[in-house]
Amino acid sequence: MKKPELLAPGGSLEKLKTAIDYGADAVYIGGEMFSLRVAAENFSKEDMQEGIKYAHDRGKKVYLTANILPHNDDIEEFEEFVKDIKNYGFDAVLVADLGLFDMMQELAPEIPIHVSTQANNINYRSAIKWYKMGATRVVLAREMSFKEIAEFQKKIPEDLELEAFIHGAMCISYSGRCLLSNYMTGRDSNMGACAHPCRWNYKLVEETRPGEYMDVFENERGTFIFNSKDLCTIRHIPELVQSGIASLKIEGRVKTSYYVATVVGAYRREIDRYCADPENYVFNEAEYEELCKVSHRPYTTGFYFGKPDENSQVYTSSSYIIDYDLIGIVK
């Protein structure tokens, strides 16, 4: 049994260091462009180099996210960006677009390529095609079950790694295919500027009665039609490890350092405990309680055990649960 990599979000240099200090094996970060997280602090080129050195000095890895779906105007800028960063020492780059994939191979062939979840990786034939083109890892769509992942593993080459999300926010659509934000606000979700209209509360209008807004009820509290709970799999470490997934990924580049420290620490401890003694492993419920101390929505296991039902949605509010405040950092 191989211990999987624990992959953490690094929305800033401080968060990268926090993730590593609390047990991450690798951190994924974004530059000031191309990384699909406009709201994150992101990394200057100087921060990138400092972060990579910090990680490598401790035997850890840093992956660069370049997983936007670019327009023509982005291509020349991306070429210059790659020329600037290709010698920084990134351990891999995440892309979702075929054009950027091709450019990475042309401009920086020494950097391994991981295919982002934005590419909607939900079947093994797609994964095999990415592998034949040169990808070393495929990030699975969040919409896959353990059963589907097991079948996936049987069909793909042994040296093609799989990465999967284990904690964090869930999109209501297949990642990369939602255009609600573009249509309703002009903010492009595929360029990192999603306004999250899936979590808004909606009213109904009859076309001959403009200005009369009627409530839409799923229950007595109203409706949040697309408002998914957050993914949490801390209680299912045995299934995750036994699935053969190479990298277990935590979502949250726009979250706080406190969030990163708490979530990474909890998963680190449980993964280590299970891998040290699988036969006698018993989940420590205190770790779930730790995860409830960070800003979060109610938790769900997502698609891992089958298609979600109505219990995977939040019907009362689109706001986060915030029951605890950070009062200080002990150094």
What is the predicted function of each stretch?
Residues 1-21, 26-29, 33, 51-52, ...:
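Surface-exposed amphipathic alpha-helical tracts and adjacent flexible/coil segments at the periphery
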Residues 37-54:
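Glycine-rich, positively charged N-terminal anion/phosphate-binding segment
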Residues 99-100:
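Alpha-helix capping/helix-boundary segments
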Residues 108:
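Conserved phosphotransfer cores of two-component systems
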Residues 122:
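Active-site PLP-lysine loop of aminotransferase-like
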